[in-house]
Structure formats: C-alpha cells, structure tokens
Amino acid sequence: MHFIVVGPMYHHYSESVVRTLNQLGHTAVFFPEMPFYENCSYLQRKLYKFGYRTLKMKWEKDWQKRAIRFGQEHAGKYTVFLCLTGGMITDGIMDAWEGFPIVLCMWDSIRRYDISFQKRLQRYTHVFAFEYEDMAYAEERFSLNMKYLPLGYDETAYYPQERDRDIDVAFVGTPLQNRLDILERVAQYISTAGGDMCVAGRWYDDTYPWKKHLFRKKHPALTKYLMNCNIPPTKTAEIYRRSKIVLNINNDVHRSISPRTFEILATKTFQLMNEGQKSYGTIDLERDLVLYKDGDDLLEKIDRYLKEPEQRNIIAAQGYADVQKFSMRELMRKMLRCI
C-alpha cells in the first residue's frame, strides 16, 4: 500500500509512523499539520489576539488547499490516506479524497474535539481510538465501530543499553500545575539528600528574562535541576537509561496508557507513575512499574527504591518484557491487519 500521512509535528511520532510503514514494506509520504497559532509569526499572533480573526481563517484555507494538492500529486491506485489526530481535516479535504480509504488514528480523546469533528468520524473508513472509553462513546453517539490502538514507542530511540545510572530521579515532559507541584517537592528531597535529578522540557520562555526570574522564584528547588528545552527522543531515551527512577506524571485528562509509559519501559528503566491510568489489557500495572497515590507516597517510594537497586531491576526487566508488543512496529502491524 501507499500511504499519504497527514499529522502533527510534535514529539516525532508522525515521523516514526512514516518510517515504520516504509520499513514494513509499504511506501509513505508525509504532509504536516500546521496549526495557525503554533506556526504563525509573532506579528500575526499579536494581531490575532487583537481581534484579526481572518488571519487564522486564511491560514487554514491555504493549508487545506496545499493538503488537497499534495494528495492529488501523490495519490495512486493503492493509496490510503492516514490521518494522525485529524485535527485539521475538513469536509472539503475529505471530499477531495473521495474514492480512497481514509484512516484516522486518534492521539487524544475524541470528546476533546467539537461536535463537527465528532460527526465527521463517520466519514472515515476506519477509526482507531487512543482513549479506550471512546469506543463505547462513539458506538452510543454515532453507531461508530472504533478499534483501540495505543500510540507505541519508537524502538529506534527507546531501547535498553548498559551504562552507569548516575541520575537518581528524572522526568521529561511539559509543564502542568500538578507536575510543577510534585517535582518541586521531589527536587527539595533530592537536594536535601545530596542526590542528582534531571527534569527536561520547555517549562518557561527563556527569551524573556522576567519569565526565568519568575519561575526561579516560584520553584527554587526545581530550577536547579531543570534543562529548559525540548529534547528529541534519542536524548530523552539517553536520560532514561542514565536514571535509577523515571517519573511518569500523567495529566488528569487521559485515562488510557500514554506512549511515555511505553517509552520508559522500553529502555528497561524503573518507572514510578501516578495512580489513575487504566491498563485496558496493555501492560500489567501491578508488576511492570510502581504506582504512587500522592506526593507523600511518591517521596516515600523514591526513598525506598533508591535503596533497593535489585528490586528496581526486577520490576524494570518485567516491564521491558511486557512492553515489546507495544512498539511502533507492532502497533502499525496491528493497524495494517485491520485495514
């Protein structure tokens, strides 16, 4: 099959999907989603804030025209259009793709999108759910038969490698209030204990000195360990392989297992994750990692497992064994069998 993949640019997941499809013997080309607010100029963003809404409308119409033209240039007899999230797909684009199979892989809950997006789901040939509970919702609301397909880890980046684990606790991700609160407490603990910690991600805009000052004032302990920049998967995996404990602090929106969970396990690293996620038949939350209830429980478990390297290794090895079936290659194979 020949895939025309349309998806977002964040975290290299689209790139991983395209590469995997090519490795599996298919051909795949990529057309990136370009949301207005994330890609426009500083001036356009300011004008939009002041009420020039037509800027966004023109941006999106131009993108839609380019997407249709890209499809026309690359479509052939055995073409499948594969939409990753589908956030910028419109009825006009789907009209232009009529006659070809159109597949949607969600990377978020469909309930976080507006009703027009949800109704459009019925136009896809196949729809794969990121949130397990979306399947029942789609069946009830739209008589739509979705299939569950988690977002897998990229095995070219996330794999085990023997090396010194010189970082006691690590976290890689974006700033959320619950993460800030938890990580400030963990940083205070690590500092007092004389350990080492690494937190990576863009947590404030360092082009403005006052934002850096404000962050340091609010989170003095965390600032000491913060690598304030976005890092690629290879660098993320390197941090995991150097860490005794990697924290997985999920947001309150998602309940299904996140790709970050798989990525940590794939490096054969011990993982501490907050309670609230559900396995839905993926990994075993009782043996592949350790869950914590709240901040106090997390600090107790960090203290305990830093002193128990053998137990960490046993749990990490079990998690690594169980996560093998959730690599990007295995999950793309599952998708291909369904379509």
Question: Which functions belong to the PLM regions below?
Answer:
Residues 82-85, 95-110, 128:
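Active-site proximal beta-strand in glycosyltransferases
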Residues 289-295, 304-310:
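Conserved acidic donor-binding segment of nucleotide-sugar-dependent glycosyltransferases
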Residues 1-49, 59-69, 84-88, 118-262, ...:
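Nucleotide-sugar donor-binding catalytic core of glycosyltransferases
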Residues 70-74, 305:
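Short amphipathic alpha-helix with an adjacent loop that forms part of the alpha/beta core around
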Residues 76, 285-287:
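Glycine-centered loop/turn motifs
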Residues 307-337:
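A charged, aromatic-enriched C-terminal amphipathic alpha-helix characteristic of glycosyltransferases
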